[in-house]
């Protein structure tokens, strides 16, 4: 039986300013039913008679209780891949199963055990999608060169998604986010894609989807949207994983990454700055967001992580207050993007970033994995990661 370790934290008491009590944690090994694997029939199939493990946990959503069982929705990312040598200036990746479709799954936690069940491939009217990088001529391209397991070059695919977060859409389906575009994707409960939103193309640009601010195209490659959550008022808040790299000049300097608000009913957007822990990192581009989850219409929980100046991983959960945060949309002008401003200049321009308070250090609770990518709120005192 294939297994993937996902620590599930319980008994983490939240008080919105500091922990009311010392948090505790329980860890579960998530198992998969016999036969649940990524099919692999490539050149080296004999070495993998049971296929490849399924990598869940790129997003996590608490969906309720069924008797004494806790249930969660989760999503995989773009599928099995491996680094390979650069081709000129371009990064390359080996996609051992290029036809892999990201999976929507359910996790059940009951009687001290956790199991991932009911895999549903993401698909559209043309059939199953895949996780391949986009073509090089569209917004959202990472300029990665994709290779097969035998190092044959693969074409970019504009139906490729690198899915990360998951949140309900209020209609029985879900919103997902993606690291490529970056994209917001609305799906039904069976994994069918209903709508996609991405950075709106400017003159002379080519886009797969629109409706989101054009500036988001400057996300660092493979660091697009990393987590999202639905607010009680129906807005979707989605986090850009790391600092934007505007004109390839701002990623190391920017003091914040962006939180994007999207109203599915009206299409209205807004953007807020989440202040990263700049002093902790060798460079600001090392900071990464892992996931977010809503507390109310103005407060979210957020995982900030990355290697610090001493090359040690840090995985922290913060409560983020958006009440006084400025909408950055009105400040985004060529040559005046806030990503290039220091604290003094931000203040002089009247730009206020979100406020934040540390809730818990996951490392202090025994978190061992490099990254935490799924965050779910079970109740007012309990989180799952």
Outline where the language-model segments fall.
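Sequence/structural signature of beta-propeller domains
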Residues: 21-385
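Gram-negative bacterial Sec-dependent N-terminal signal peptides
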Residues: 1-20
């Amino acid at each position: 039986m294939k297994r993937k370790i996902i620590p599930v934290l319980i008994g983490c008491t939240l008080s919105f300013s500091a922990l009311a009590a010392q948090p505790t944690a329980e860890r579960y090994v998530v198992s998969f039913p016999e036969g649940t694997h990524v099919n692999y029939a490539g050149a080296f199939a004999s070495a993998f008679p049971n296929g490849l493990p399924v990598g869940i946990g790129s997003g996590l959503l608490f969906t309720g209780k069924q008797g004494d069982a806790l249930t969660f929705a989760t999503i995989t990312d773009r599928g099995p891949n491996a680094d390979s040598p650069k081709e000129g200036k371009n990064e390359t990746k080996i996609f051992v199963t290029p036809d892999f479709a990201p999976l929507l799954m359910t996790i059940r936690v009951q009687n001290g055990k956790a199991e991932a069940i009911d895999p549903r491939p993401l698909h559209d009217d043309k059939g199953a999608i895949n996780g391949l990088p986009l073509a090089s001529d569209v917004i959202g391209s990472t300029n990665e060169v994709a290779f097969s397991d035998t190092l044959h070059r693969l074409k970019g695919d504009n139906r490729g998604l690198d899915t990360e977060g998951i949140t309900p859409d209020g209609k029985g389906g879900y919103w997902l986010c993606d690291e490529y575009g970056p994209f917001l994707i609305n799906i039904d409960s069976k994994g069918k894609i209903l709508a996609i939103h991405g950075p709106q193309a400017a003159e002379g640009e080519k886009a797969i989807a629109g409706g989101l601010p054009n500036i988001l195209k400057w996300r660092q490659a493979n660091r697009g949207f990393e987590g999202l959550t639905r607010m009680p008022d129906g807005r979707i808040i989605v986090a850009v994983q790391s600092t934007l790299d505007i004109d390839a000049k701002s990623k190391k300097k920017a003091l914040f990454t962006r939180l994007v608000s999207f109203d599915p009913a009206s299409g209205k957007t807004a953007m807020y700055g989440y202040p990263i822990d700049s002093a902790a990192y060798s460079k600001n581009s090392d900071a990464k967001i892992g996931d977010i989850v809503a507390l109310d219409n103005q407060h979210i929980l957020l995982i900030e992580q990355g290697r610090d100046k001493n090359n040690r991983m840090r995985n922290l959960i913060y409560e983020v207050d958006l009440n006084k945060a400025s909408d950055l949309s009105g400040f985004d002008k060529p040559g005046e993007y806030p990503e290039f401003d220091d604290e003094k200049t931000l203040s002089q321009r009247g730009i206020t970033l979100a406020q934040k308070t540390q809730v818990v250090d996951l490392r202090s609770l025994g978190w061992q994995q490099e990254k935490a990518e799924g965050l779910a709120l079970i109740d007012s005192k309990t989180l799952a990661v």
